[in-house]
Amino acid sequence: MTEQAPTRLRAVVFMALLVTALVTTVGYRLAGAENDDIALGPGEVTVQIDIEHSRFLPERLVIAEGTRVRFLVVNGDPIHHEFITGDPEVHRRHAQGTETQHPSIPGEVSVDPNGKAITTFTFEEPGRFEFACHLPRHYEYGMHGEIEVVPTATG
């Protein structure tokens, strides 16, 4: 083996590691951009909202105006939660957090421990909307997120 062989091998290994790091970084950035910049919709879409350790995942959604969203809420916690979305008035009505069960109202659903529930909501106009759990101390603990409704592109 010549003296150049170990040097060449080190150079090849270094380049392979560099390419791997670049591909991983670019892929991560593209995945992040997809989640933050591309709106769901228009039309009808289904979004799964997971509840883990009294947190909503994802915490932020971008949705095109006019989109009807079917929220599948999956509660991985051993306690009750709720999923409420809508304008600030909806959240003011629920701020006391005394309702453990909700009637069939679009954008409002109660979720049993380790259970699943479905609600739908149509986002008619652009703006920022909140989703939250208003059961006692859940909101303060961090159980809320944001939905940004963006205008649909016109051709």
Describe the residue ranges of each PLM region.
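N-terminal Sec-pathway targeting helices
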Residues: 4-16
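Beta-strand cores of secreted/periplasmic/IMS beta-sandwich domains, seen most often
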Residues: 59-84, 117-125, 129, 149-151
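Extracellular/periplasmic metallocenter environments
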Residues: 23-30, 34, 55, 106-155
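Short aromatic-acidic-glycine turn motif
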Residues: 89-99, 155
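N-terminal edge beta-strand
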Residues: 38-69
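Hydrophobic membrane-insertion alpha-helices, especially the h-region
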Residues: 13-26
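Residues that flank catalytic or metal-binding motifs in active/ligand-binding sites
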Residues: 45, 67, 79, 107, ...
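Histidine-centered active-site/metal-ligand motif
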Residues: 81, 94, 138
